[in-house]
Amino acid sequence: MKVRASVKKMCPKCRVIRRHGKVMVICSNPKHKQRQG
């Protein structure tokens, strides 16, 4: 899980979602997991 100021899709499988008011990226590739913070 990467914590970043700006979350971006890193590949076509990445999905940008909101959970509990936080913007997150979920993907089949675990390296692409990010959240904003």
From Swiss-Prot:
The keyword Cell membrane does not apply. InterPro entries: Ribosomal_bL36 (IPR000473), Ribosomal_bL36_sp (IPR035977). One of its GO terms (biological process) is translation. GO terms for molecular function: structural constituent of ribosome. Transmembrane segments: none annotated. The keyword Chloroplast applies. It is found in: Plastid, Chloroplast. It comes from the Eukaryota. Keywords: Chloroplast, Plastid, Ribonucleoprotein, Ribosomal protein. GO terms for cellular component: chloroplast; ribonucleoprotein complex; ribosome. PANTHER family: 50S RIBOSOMAL PROTEIN L36, CHLOROPLASTIC, LARGE RIBOSOMAL SUBUNIT PROTEIN BL36C. NCBIfam families: rpmJ_bact (TIGR01022). Belongs to the bacterial ribosomal protein bL36 family. This is Large ribosomal subunit protein bL36c. It comes from Ostreococcus tauri.
